Amino acid sequence: DHMGCYGYSRNTTPNMDRVCQEGMRFDQYYCSGAPCLPSRASLVSGIFGIRNGAVGHGGTAADRRLTGPGREFMDQVDQSNFHNIFRRAGMYTASVSTFAERHSSWWFNAGFNECYNVGGCGGESGEEVLPLALDWLRRNKDRDNWFLHVHFWDPHTPYRVPESFGNPFEDVPLDTWIDDEILQKHIHTTGPHTAQEINMFDDQENPRYPRHPGSVMDRHGLRRVIDGYDCGVLYADTLVGQIFDLLREQGVYEDTAIIITSDHGENLGE
């Protein structure tokens, strides 16, 4: 919900907000299973995790349920997934994403004619992804009926926006609902991904990700986390804006249906 079109006070999504103003906003659109893998399994299959089998990130909980003896020559879940709907409708489909490799969830690529993987396993930043998307659009500018899926990880932990982007929110106040009482409750709560162990199981900081703190022990740490997330959202929005600019340059922006979605958000103390 850290988007202007959903009422967030910080200017994190000017480009996506414009799409929202010109299009449709979904107010009752909920992640049916978290984190990433089960959420996307449900998103692309249209089947809740309790039925498709993917309900976690490890062990058998991370595997989709086998169809069993009734499986036909081609898996029917994959054949009827979100991406294949476009392909069966006659569209040429392509994806720029590392998701399938990150989670060994190769079913995610079902339905795409082309798949591009920068090889970062989800640890890459958007400036590695954007050139592939722009190149694809330039090479296919004369093609009709296409579906291009572009995946940016930048709002995801660890926060990895390039330092050269700066911090546009350095002097912008945080939401006031996170008062000292709420912050203290989080500081004294233990467990994976809590304020004490943001990395999941430890509070160590990685020099590779200077925006990403290992813990939140005071309001300075709180600001680092929220600024890190918001910078990731704004950076992704900036990259998405460059895609929109190219579509306008090619004269197809008004004829293109744009879908902006995510597999989950971030729990920032709510």
Regions of interest found by a model, annotated:
Residues 1-270:
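Catalytic domains that recognize anionic headgroups
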